[in-house]
Amino acid sequence: MNETTRTYDVIVIGGGPVGENVAERVRAAGLSTVVVERELLGGECSFWACDPSKALLRPVVARADASRVPGLDPAVAGPLDVERVLAHRDRMSSYWKDEDQAEWLNSVSVDLIRGHGRLTGPKQVAVQTPEGDTVVLTARHAVAVSTGTRATLPPIPGLDTARPWTSREATTADKVPGRLAVVGGGVVAVEMATAWQGLGSQVTMLVLDNGLLERMEPFAGELVTDTLREAGVDIRFNTTVTSLDREGGQDGEVRITLSDGGQLAADEILLATGRAPQTRDVGLESVGLTPGDWLAVDDTFQVTGVDGGWLYAVGDVNHRALMTHQGKYQARIAGTVIGARAKGEPIHDAPWGAHVATADHAAVPQVVFTTPEIASVGLTSREAEQSGRRIEVVDYDLARVAGAHQYGEDYRGRARMLIDTDRNTVVGVTFAGPGVGELVHSATIAVAGEVPLDRLWHAVPAFPTLGEVWLRLLETYRG
């Protein structure tokens, strides 16, 4: 077992999309940089979340959309080619190999050390390599923790022997389970229920709450509920799992006991019950922090409670916005501010300045890839009410937009825009309906840009597109 030492300007622990982008921005500022990664470069999003899940969902959603188009509906009535769908999923996940990411990291002159990195003190990281060697790293300026999150499992009796799916197994399974139970009602739960039901599984959703997608506008979850039920998904609200038992060994069915005393049998069970930070074993105790905690940060991503301003936490691990695109935004901010501080340059930390992540508080976009799609940015009406602002809620039936008529028959959807009446700007938008994911960036620009409604009135939408809903929302507001 060998021990070596190296010194860099910046050390990044975690080589997912966030860590890669921190490293690239820091290197662009002229600082020497190393990424430490214990699994695959590209992280959860590339191999176990965003990419494989959307590859499973795309043919399911595309078939649903095509079935509404006159003339196409008979052509798409049959079952999907599961083998080809899974092969496409494998390609989109690069067959769980990260050579391309490693080549990209090398192309931007960032070093890579494969192994488990742990903080051992201020600006110090020890890496245990797969070969059993130790590499002791010292940072001249900063260490950035970008280790992401892991699935959390509730303490259900029988959990260990039931071998439940988490999101990782749900996105990488090599066959369609005959019966799939999904515990949860959030984004992972509804997307995986959509995907596997569309691929031929009989899905039952066991939901603790009164509805799906409870953090979004109520109509979003209601529309998804209706469509899932029409597709054959059995959704049971106000339901908890009290015990699990997998009978007959590894391939046996799972017996699920429910809070009402009833039982359910499934071939697989997915627990989509939340995320926790990957901080249990990264050496937080060596710098006075608690292992397993989320890392609290300021708007430049310096970790609070650690002296010296050298420790940063970027991406899901800081619990600000658990989405890859927002983590990459944070990475661009963090990498830039680390470079500026290392050079002694002024820090522009006013709202919307170059060195602060103001959008984390005001303009986080999200798309849920179900049928129908859900897209949102900014505040919901519930959040707006809690904020104490004077808000006017503007709703519009998306089915009344000409572009929806072209999209297909029996289009169902809804749009909601929240207006801050004191500032005359948009502070939140939610769309629900087929194809609305591509509308979210226009909404993000309106919210992040704080575009006055009088100016937004001059942004003319093309006819006949779904984007014409912007005009209809503004007309509804203006009266």
What role is predicted for each listed range?
Residues N2-R6, C45-V136, R140, M216-T242, ...:
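N-terminal Rossmann-like dinucleotide/flavin-binding domain of flavoprotein oxidoreductases
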Residues N2-G16, V176-G186:
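Beta1/beta-strand and adjacent pyrophosphate-binding region of the FAD-binding site
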Residues R91-D98, T172, P177-A181, V187-G248, ...:
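Rossmann-like dinucleotide-binding cores of NAD(P)H-dependent redox enzymes
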Residues D160-V176, Q263-E345, D349-G353:
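FAD-site-proximal beta/loop scaffold in flavoenzymes
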Residues R6-Y8, G132-A142, S259-E268, D307:
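Core beta-strand elements of the Rossmann-like FAD/NAD(P) dinucleotide-binding domain
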Residues A75-V76, D111-R114, R118-P130, L199-D299, ...:
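A Rossmann-like FAD-binding core segment of flavoenzymes
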Residues I11-E39, D51, A55, P59-A62, ...:
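Flexible, glycine-rich terminal cap/loop adjacent to redox cofactors
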Residues C50, T147-Q202, I235, E285-D307:
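Glycine-rich dinucleotide-binding loop and its adjacent helix/turn
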